[in-house]
Each structure stands twice: as structure tokens, then as C-alpha cells.
């Protein structure tokens, strides 16, 4: 009793709650024990901790232990014996129902145990029917194992007990020691006996006799350990006692060590308990000697895996327990503890002769052998069990051999050898600290419950494994008979042994340090095993079976290893028995991992084990698998041979020396193992791969599977046959149990070995060594390994691996991570592991790889393989070029992907091809980089754009788009509402607010579209807006009646103090009355305010000046409203607005002090600064809703002020909502300082970059607003002229995304808008024209359809009736005329083609001519249509300009190249278009402002001429100046033209500047600076003098006069005077011409009709001159007269023979020539004409400025459509503007000069006009529309 108490007090492993009961029970048991009390003081101490743990973990166990203690100590041993059988058959039932047997029964059973011991040599039938002849221990082992049969891996008693306890008792207990387990087991047994007395009794009877001897020996060593209480505790745990004879003794000896470990067992895995149990058997105690199945074993018997954190004692506890157990074990098992004895025992056990083993150590060996002989499978399983339990576990193994071996794939052949070896290893280790360490591994081994499942799993796996059974790898250590289906062929397995032998040599040196690891018994045996394996490895390919056999003989640890092995061996177990021999040899390699390390199994068994254990220690358990892998790769090859992974040859060649310690695929095994067996067993490289040198790279993989299993065996051996091997096999659940304890030791010992194996297996050097293999391995090996892994995993291995390994994987995460590196055996086992880099990814536990190759293989093998493949391929060197490219520091000669992004979303890509080139004398190929295939693809195929559910219906042209637009807006709103806030915006406090406001902005636009742009007059629109601004309001207010509203207020009124002040003070009212009596209303008001009589004050103030009223309201708001509550900002602002304090209303939301950055403290409310003064911004919705629901006169100003306030605080969307609803917002360009909105949702005032202006959503939303306010609202004018440029940007973005058809539609829409606008804007500048033209041209080039070019226009014309257009042109006589009259587009096409030809020939002259001709024609028609058609003219001009853009688009290729040069061409080809462009910019303003707007339009023509001159100038070089100027102007949209030119300097007609000022307002200031300069001067002068006169005469006449006048300006500085004279002449000539033409029109019906209406020739004949007053008859008669008119080619006009004045206009041409030369100069930028122009331009400039684009617009009217495109750039030339009209003569006369003269003459005379029309008669027709001679002139 004293000892037990001491033990209890001494054992730290006991848990506090268990210490008392367990101590009592153990004390009783110790007292009852014969020798155990004295011998097992240490053991008891150690055992009692385990008992405490058991009790602590399982409360019922304590209680049962107490019962069993009360029953008697002797019963415990008997009961233990009974438990042994029970563990076999009824371990599950016992575990499940431990309490069923009565205490008496348990006692009786305990009493039977001595009998079992006595019957050690007798055959004892177990409940399972197993009969063991050798010894009671063996019999009991068989019996115990029979229950374990379902769980072959649950060989460690402690682990099993713990697992059982965990599973059934709900407590997670780590059996620190066998003794501890026994003491607890006594309680458990007592409990179990209570639960199932009959069963235990039977088993006890059978096993008692067989186990009495063994248990007696154990009792002699450690009586307290085997005391009945411990046995009872075990039984209570539900763990049957394992009756082990000699094996039990060895186990007890190991248990002693395990018990030392068990001190730390609470911290360690159940393996510590297992080891302690093993050590206790080494002790002489009978009861303690009786090895009870560990919880894991019992669970294994139940085929249940218990994963309890307590099941595995901490490594330190296991070590401590082992240390304690070792001394006790030394008493009886000193031989076993000695390494020599251990080696002998192992050899005896390994040899299939059980009789050879000594009774103590020999007895253990004999028992092991007997057990092995009896049941190879059982021995294998028992070996696993023994790994955890130790020699006692060997008995368990026997039972397991009987039952569980059948289940475990590798039970029969190899298990017997292993269990024996492990007990021996445990015995030698027990005496030393290695025993303690072994105890820790034992705890790791304690993961037997897992092993149980694994065994069952392996049983399931057995069928598939048979083919590749590697029984030899594991089982053959102890017995060759066992073979695992995963084992490589015998050839491979044997070479592994040989390698193992070599490893043994290597490992032994390394093992020298291992003795410390040896502290954990397991590490040492692995060393022995490793010593043995080298021989098998060496003989791996030759005779794997025999070498494995030797290896196993050397390795006592393999028995413990079966547990871990079942996990890994589960793969091999299937065909362990017969087929295993050859394949098992592959399987032995798993054992070999440890055996390989030992090298010579038998000879080195004893001593080598400890050193080898230390070898693993040398490797850091947590050391990187990759790093160790490299050094250990050689070892891996040796071991690998056994596994025959791809590395057999490779590994051997690569790292055979290092590999001995591990079982990396040995080179020999590589040869044979490289064959299918490795594949079958592992997903390792194919046999050929392993054989290949390249396999060396993958050798880690090949060897890694082998090494992994060998490691498992090695660990088992090194760890006293404890589950340490399982630990390398960390995958299996047994590993999990054993890992906690093993990992420390196994990490040190086995872990390093595994690391070595991994190193050997995946040696980086190996890969490099066989570069060819790298390429081969990546593909072949990867596929091979994947296939192998798949079969292995898919087969029974998968079941076991999945069931067991996966648990290990689960557990390994916490343990394997550190183990993973040390115990990368899994990595070494699987070819994947050979890939170090992959393994880290594959193995979450460790960066280097999964702890278990099996696990890794199953889940990761496929992925790792590709990764591996890639890595090797990357290692290959490139063949450097010899042409100097090799000096490129960027090494571009190696090749790189090349991408080129083209127009229309096209992407051209080219990837380099890396071709391996082999050369003589090189093992690895070298890479030759060659260009790959060039592919053309669409960007959308690579980066598909995020398209909404609904596609945008743009461009928005008609009302039919409304429905689609609403649907698109709704889809976008839904997307915004469901989208998450970007991460980069989440830091912003206003991110959520901005998101809501953005959604609200889109909703407002949707309401605007739904209500056709009208919000004020519609009740539905008002309701919709209210619901948006107040989503929570909805119908809450309508649901309340007025009565309801007043009722509550009435009830609250008595409580409302504010209502009282008005009537509270009667004296104040009297004073007020007196003041009013005196007539001092203002004084009365402020008195009432002071007295807070607000009603009085407001009534009186309402009769006074508004300022007083506003002040009163302001005071009321500040003193009453603002202080009432905290949310009155919106109400206060609204009252301010009602009072008329519009600008001050925002002060109620955000005080000025806050806007100034100050924080004011209120002295009244006392709130201080608690409130954020900026919170008032959040009231903007309420304020907006109040204002919209209660409109007041100036509330729009208040909304604008509110919007500006919000904008200042970066609340852009909210500000834009206020702007939109105010209806007073200004939309404009970025350069407009007055613009409130440029794009909806974009703050143009705070642009960090221009990227925001390219946002498609903002552009499209703004387009939707424009659509709602213009198209849907019925407005014919675009309200947002600046938006065209953004639409062009959007069109470009569409083209970039490959949506070219939509981009073309936008181009067409922009061109149509430019033509349709009646009031050109400064934003309609040359850049816009050129941009549209260029994009259209590129789209036409990349698409088959016509696009928006002039070609498409004819097609459009065809749609409208191209035949009629041709017929009309034919009837009219001039196709160009008809074209121009019929439709600017078609007309321009024909004439343009002609004109373009001329300009093409000579751009400068042709431009002048063209512009001149067009201007003339345009001037004539425009004048005719000018007033009525002026806007249309400007509209026409724009259309013309686009048309000309298109017409010139035929020349787009030239123009598109660059604006400068193309402009020249375009101008040359179409000068009129340039004028048109000018008109678009300035014409309208000029027209609008000056009465002579039409004439201004004519001057703009002259400006067009300047544009043409610009083109010409560009040719001459002078144009560049103007053009560049123009460019600058265009950049500044409004003033692009004028600014370009120096018209302002020319602006000598400062008088006109006043005019310009007038027109300037029209332009809005865009063009004023620039456009004014160039175009206005001429137009201004013409407007000033001739314009008035011309207007008096006729609009058209005025135009010609203007032109002539301007031509004069163009000609020279005298041009002004000449212009005046010419204008007078022109007026007269025009009048005469009108008359003559009228007559001619009457005479010639053809000419009049087309000119008049531009309709059909019929209309021309019949109604062409109807405007003039010509009748059908008179027309015919006049037609004859018209014959008097002839076209003078020199004058380029019609000359009336009858009218001598007709020739005079021709004379007028000379002045223009003078001017024309200068104009061209002016165009070119020459000073001469510009001065002339300059004089007018100033006037024009000023005039143009007024119109902002005034100068240009006039020109537009002057030469409407044709010049617009080309003209815009030339717009700069001022003289030309005048000359432009005149240019018609230029064709006949020299370039520009003819224009002015011609234009003057033409303008002044009908002939001139007619001449111009011939050049381009379109304008003439237009003039005719005006009802003038235009038609005749055109003809």
C-alpha cells in the first residue's frame, strides 16, 4: 500500500481525479501481488499515473478500478488474463459495455489470469477460437488480438485502451504506460468483467494457463504495474487484457519505460500508455505483467478508431514512464533491454522460430516467433500493436494475429517478426533513456484504435493490395511470410534490404547520436531495422523477401510499427501473406524505412537500433523535408529498392549512402521496384523511372513511398517496436495516437530518418542528376505516380489510407507539420514526396509534403505530379545564341509572350516555343526558344467585358428606345444595389453614402425618362420622386387623416411648452399694441421677436419690406427651429427658402463656421461639440424633398446652392441630383467655369485625372438625361452639345471591345447631330469632326459594311430613293446641283468627288477652288435660304461638314493619318466643308446676333475659305500655322478657329467687334477668342456695310456681296472698298440676274424646279420658280429666253448675253484675284491677304466672338455642308472666308484670288452665282429655295 501511494504521489501521469481511486486500487493490487509491489514501485508509480489518466479520462474506470481493487488484487491478474481474450473477441463489446461484468466476475477472471500464466505453454483456445501453443502470453495475445482482429493496427495495448476509453467511456485518456494501463486496466477489467464476466472468465481460463508464466515473470519485475487494480481499470476501460507470455514480458519491460513516459502520458499520445504497458510486461509483475489490450487495441478490436487527445500521452510523459518502467523491466527483462538481447530476440522473432527466443528476452523472441509462426498476419497486426504496447503488445499481436491479422492486409507474413522485434527493441531501450523515448513513441504508437480501423481498413484493402502486397516491407521484418499487396516485387524488396544494410552502415554511424532518441525505444529499433533493411535494400531487386526477412529480424520495432504500418501497410496488407513475398518485399521497404536505416537487420539489431534512432534525431524533426531529402536521397534509393519506386536505380545512384538510414527507393529496388509493384504500392514512378537515372530526381518520390513505409518500420523498430513506425506512417490513425508521443522521439529519431528518407526520396540533387528524367519524370512519372496513387488509393489502400491515413492527415496537421519535415516518410513513400516543392503545397501539415505519402498521394498526387513536372522542366538550360543576343541583359533571346492590341478589340499574340535539344555528352536536354504561332483573337475572348443582363440600347435616337432604356437603367440600378463596396473605398467614411447616392441618381434619371423628361407638372412624377427621396415615407402620411394628425398633437399640446410663449405674457402684448399705436411697426416686430412672440412678429413683418420678413424668419429658425430638436436642419433650411433667404438656406445645414473648418460651441443648448456640424449634409434629401413638395419662387436657386455645398464636400451624386431637379443647372464642357455638370456622377472640378471622363456609365447616364430632356420632351435641339465628344469617346471604347457595329452607329448619330443642329456650338469643333471621320474610316476598313462614310450615305440615299435623286440631278442638269439640293449628303458626294479630285491634284489651289466653288454655290443658296434657312444652313453646314468628312472619307486614309495633313487634303478636296465647320462653330452665333446673320454665314464661308486656305496653307506650309492655331482653338472648343488665326490683329474693323460682342453672347463664349479672330472679321465687315445693304436687297444677294466684300478683304487691304463697290454692283447685278433668272427659270423649267425645292425635276419644272412668281407658261417662254444665258468657263458662271452686266461680275473677279492671292496667303498664314482679311476679321472677330463661334457659323452658312469637314481646320484663314465665297472663280482664275473676285462677282450677279453652282451647284439650289435666283444660278 505504501508503494502504491508513493507511486500515486510520485506518478505525475495520474490525473488528479484519478489519483485517489487509482492509487487505492493500485495499492491493493500491489499488496496482493506477490513480487510486484517491490519490483514495480517505479512501474507502479508510472502505472498509477496512467491509471490516474485512465480514471481521469474515464470516470467510470476509476469507479471500476475501485471496485476491482475491493475485489482483490489477485483477481486483477486473472482478470487481466481474461481481459486478454476479451480484448480479442469482445474488445468492442467490452469497450462499449465495460460495466456489464460484475466486480465478482472480474475478480474471478483476474483469478483466472494466473492460470493463464501457468498455461503459458499450453494451447489456450481464445474466444475467437485462436489457440496458442507457445505460451499463455502468446495465447492471450492471440486472444487479445482476436478482438483486435477487426482492428489489426490496434496492437498497442495502451493506445487501444485509451482509444477504447475514449470511444466508450467518453473520456480521452492517454495510456502513459502499460503498467498504468494495467492498473487502470485492472479497474477497467473489473468493470469489464462486471460487464461481461462470462467472456472474461472464458478468456481468462484459456489464457491464464498460457499467460501465467509470462505474467508471473512480469509480476516479478513490476508487480504493482500488473496489479489487479490496473487490470481492472483496463477492463473498466473496456479494454480486454492481453495475455502475453514472453511477449508480454518484453512488453512489460517496455511498459516500464512507457510508464516513465506515462508520467507525461497525459501530455502524450496513447502510445506512451502503450509503451508503458509494454514496459510493464517487461516487469515481472504478474497482474501488471498481464498485458491488457490498450484502449486503442480494444477499439481496434471493435474496429473503432478512437481519436482522443488524451489517448496519446505526451512524448515526455512516455519517455518518463518508459524510464520508470525500464528499471523495473530490467529486473526481469534486462536481457531484453540490452540492445544485444533485443537484437537476439528480434533475430529470433524475425527468424520464424519462436522457440529460439529467450524466455525473458529469449522468451519474448520465442513468443514473438511462435506468435509469428502461428499467425503471420496476426503478428503483423500485433507487430503494430506491439509497436505501441511493446512485448505485452506482442501477446496482443498474437491475438490480433489470430483475428485482426486476417483483417489487416499484412498481418500474417510480417507481423510476427515485427512484434517480436519491437518488443526486443523496447526491452533494450527500456533500460536506457531510449525507453522513455520509446514510451513517447509508444504513445504515438498508442494510436492503435486508429490502427484497429486501419486493420479493418487493411482487411478491406487486402484484396486490392495482394497483387502488390509489400508484406515483406513491414511484416517480413519479423516474418517474411507476410506480404503486402503494395509491396514491390520480391526483387525490389530484397534490394531494399540490401540498401537497408548499406543504410545500416550509414545509419549506424548516424545512429551513434540516436541513443538519446533511443530514449524512446522505438527510435533504436528502427535503427536496427534500418541496419537490417540495408541488406534487403542491397538485395532489393534480387531477393526482396529474404532481405526483408533479415531486415525484420534485425528490427524488433516492426511489431509496434504494424500499427503505423497498418496505416501505411494498409495499402500493402491485402496480399501480405502469399503474394506478398515478392511484392511484400516492396512492402517491407515501408518497414525498411526503419530497417534500411539499420542496414544489417540481425547483426546490428541490438546496437544499431539506438544509433539509428539517433540518426533520425540528427535530422531535425521539423527540418525541411526538402533539405533533408537531398542528403538522404541516397538512403532513399537504397530503401526505395525495396519499394521499387521509380528511383531504385536512380535512387541508388543518387544517394544510396544517405538512404541506408531510410528506405528511400534503393537503386536495386529501383530496378525491380521500378516495375509495376512500386506503381501498385505507390503512386511512385514507374519501374522504368525508378530504374532511370532521371528517377533519382523522383527517387524521393519512389523512395519516399518506400522510405515512408520503411520509415514506419524503422520508427517502429527504433521506437521499441512501438507505434513510432506508425508515426512515420503518420497517416494512419495509430500514428495519430502514437504521433503525440512518437513525434518528439520519432521526430528526433524516426523523424530525422523520415526526413532523411524524404531527403533521399525527393533529393533535389537526384532530379538535377537526371535532367532527362526531369522531363520524363514530370510527364511519365507524374502520370505513373498519379495512376499508382489512384490505384493504391482507390484500392483497399485507399480505404485504409483514406480511413486511416486521412485521419492521420487530420491529426498530422497538428503533429505532422513538425513531423512532416522530420517524418517526410510519407513524402519519401510517395513519388510526389520526391518533389520537395510540391510536397509543401501538397501537405498542409508541412510545407514540404503531407505527413503520409499515402495521404498525399491520394489527395495530392495528381496535383503534385504536374507541379513536379513543371519544376524539372524549368531547370533545363537554354541554348544561348551566338549572334550577340546572348549579351542581352534581359535575356530576351529566351523568348517571351508577345501581345499586340489592335483596333476593334483585335489581339495578336505569339508565345515562344521551347524545344528541348539533346546533344552528345549531356544528360539533360537544353532548351531552344523559337517563335511560336501567331494568333489573332478578340480581346473579349480573353477578357470578356462585364456585360449587364440588359444591353444598352444606344445610340438613343428616337422615342422607341424609351422602353429599352428604362430596362437598362433598371438592370444597372439592381447591379449597383447588389454590388459590394470596393475594398479601396471601404476606408472612406462616405463610401456607403456615396454608393446610395449613386443609386439614387440613377433612379432619378429613370424617373425622368419614364416621365418624358417632365417632373414638375405630373403627379405621378412627384410621387415617384418623393418615394425615392423618402423611401420610408411611402404611404405612411396619406394613411393618416388630418384628424389623426391633429389628435395626437392636441393631446400633446398641453405638454408642449413652445406654444405658450405667445400668450403667456399679456404685458408683452400690451407693449406691442402700444408700439403699433405709435406706428412703429419695425420696433414692434423686433420687440415681438425679443419676447418670442413669433406669430405677432411675422404678421407685422409680412406687411413690411421683404428684408424685414426674411430677418424675422431667420431669427425664428435660429431660435426656435434649430434648437427644438437635433434633426431640424432640413426644416430650418426650408423655412429659410420660403422666407427668400435662398443663399443662406444652406447655412442651416452646414454652418459657415464648419465650412471654414471651425468648430463652434453653442452656449445655449450646452451640447458643446458633441454633434458633428457636418452631419447636416445628411439632411440634403429631406431638404430637397421639402422644396420639391412646396415650390417657391426662387427655390431653384436654393437647390443649386445646396448642390454646390454638397459638391464642395465631394458628394458628387447628391449634388447632381439637386442640380438636375433644380432645372437651373448648367451643362457644359470641362473648360466652362460656369458649368455645374459635365457628366453625371463625375466631379469635373476635382478630377485627379481625366480617366473619370472616360467612364462609360457616366457617359451613358448623361446620354439618358439628354434623351429624356430632348427627344422625349419633344425638343428638336440637342441640349448637351458638349456630349458629342463624349459619345465619340464611348464609340472608341466600343470599337476597342470589338463592338464595331455599335461604334459605327454612334459615329452616324454624332454626324447626324452635327448636321441637325441649328445652332452650332463651340464644342462642334474640328477635332470632333476629324475624330468622327477617322473612327468611321477605320471602322469601314475593318468591317465589310459601308459604315458612316459617304459611301454609306449613298446607300442611305438609296433607301430614301437614290433613283429619284439621280433623276432629279439629271433633270436639274447638274448632278452636283441636284445632289446638293436633294440632300446635302448625296449632293456633296457627287460634287465632293469632283472637288476632291481637284484638291487631290493640287490641294492648295484645288482647296481654294473647291472652297471657292462651294462657297459660291453655298453662298448663293445660303443667301437664298439664308434667313429662313440660316439655321438649317448652319445645320446644313454641319451636315455638309460631316458629309464632306464622309465624302472626304474616301480620302480618309490620307486624312486619317493625321489631322494636320488630312485636313489639308480634306480642305483641298472639300473646302466648303471647312466653311461648314466654321459655320457650325460661329455661323450660328453670328447669325443669331447680327441682323445680317445670313451674311455672317457668308463671311464664315470666307472663313471657310480661310479653312481651305489653311489646307492650301498646309500644302504651302503656311497652313500649318493656321491649322495649328486651329488645333489649339479646337482644343479650347469655343475659340478653336479664331484663336488659331490672328484675325484679332487683323481686326482693323473694330467697329465690327462691337457686332461681334453682340453675337458673342450667342456663342456662349466658346468660340469668341479663336473663332472671332479668323472668321468674324470678314463676316463682321460684310455684316457692317454690305450686310445691311445686302439684307435690304436680298439675303442671297447679301451673301454674294458679303463674299465679294470679303473677297475684297481677302484680295487686299483695299478689299473693303472694293467690296463695298462690288457689293453695290453685286446688288444690282443680282437684281438683274434675279430677273433674268426668273425669266430663264420660266423659260427653262428644269433649272428653276430643282433649284427651288431640291425635289424632283418635276417639282423644278412645275414649281421650281413658284416662289419667285413664275408661271408654268411663263416658265416655258422664259426657258427659251434662258438660252441667252450661257456658262462662261472662264468666269465659271452663267452669263446673260442680253445683260452686259453679267460680264461685269467677271471683272469683279480680278479684285478677288488680288485678294485671292492674299487670301491664299492668309490661308497659308501669309500676311498680305490676312491684313485685308484682318481688317474685316477684327470686326468679324468681335462679331464672331459675340457668337463665340460666330465667325465659323457664318462661314457655315456661306458654304454650308461641303466645307464643314475640311473647312474647320482652314477656318483659320480669314481672307479665305471672304474668298471662300468668291473661290468659284479660282477654278478659272488663280487659286484664292479668283474666289474673292468670283465670289464677289457671283454674289453680285446671277451669272457669278450660276458659275459657282457649276463648280458646286448644290448651294445654288439652296439659294433657289430661298426663292431667289438660286435655282437659276445653280443651273
Swiss-Prot record:
One of its GO terms (biological process) is vesicle-mediated transport. Residues 512-526, 655-667, 1728-1739, 1760-1772 have a biased composition (Pro residues). Residues 123-133, 153-164, 424-459, 682-691, 741-752, 848-857, 1040-1059, 1516-1533, 1553-1562 have a biased composition (Polar residues). Keywords: Autophagy, Endoplasmic reticulum, ER-Golgi transport, Membrane, Protein transport, Transport. Residues 138-148, 473-482, 708-724, 1588-1606, 1623-1656 have a biased composition (Basic and acidic residues). The keyword Membrane applies. InterPro entries: Sec16_CCD, Sec16_N, Sec16_Sec23-bd. It is a peripheral membrane protein. Transmembrane segments: none annotated. This is COPII coat assembly protein sec16. It comes from Neosartorya fischeri (strain ATCC 1020 / DSM 3700 / CBS 544.65 / FGSC A1164 / JCM 1740 / NRRL 181 / WB 181). The gene is sec16.
